Amino acid sequence: MEDYFYNKIFIRVESVICMCTKHFTKIDVHPQELYYGITKIPTHISVARCISLNILHNYYGMSYKTLSDRSNMTDKSVMKCVAKAREYIHTDKLYQDIYNLAISKLYGKS
């Protein structure tokens, strides 16, 4: 039963993040693209991936292990991605804009 709810949460967050990323970058991002590629992935996909993992970890309390299983990444890579988003949300305009729009769409607040 827990997997069912986690899957619903993953689908909702990933689709909202992709929509918000498209809004600011004008490039289509699809949820199935978020976890493809290991190196040299395009910026818009990297931003969407990091922000979605950050929200799933910090707002929904999902463990790094759960996130790594979903994303086919190592636990360490997921940790780095979450930390990167946590820092860039406060320092990078693109991350800020996408994050703030996503939070307002998901939770109705800024």
Where are the model-predicted features located?
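Short alpha-helical "recognition helix" segments of helix-turn-helix
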Residues: 65-70, 74
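Short, charged/polar micro-motifs that form catalytic or ligand-binding hotspots
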Residues: 39-43, 57, 68
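Short, amphipathic alpha-helical "recognition" segments used to contact nucleic acids or chromatin
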Residues: 46-62
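Short Lys/Arg-enriched helix C-cap and helix-to-coil transition segments
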Residues: 89-110
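DNA major-groove recognition helix of helix-turn-helix
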Residues: 57, 82-83, 89
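Short, Lys/Arg-enriched anionic-surface-contact patches
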Residues: 21-49, 73
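General nucleic-acid-binding
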Residues: 1-23
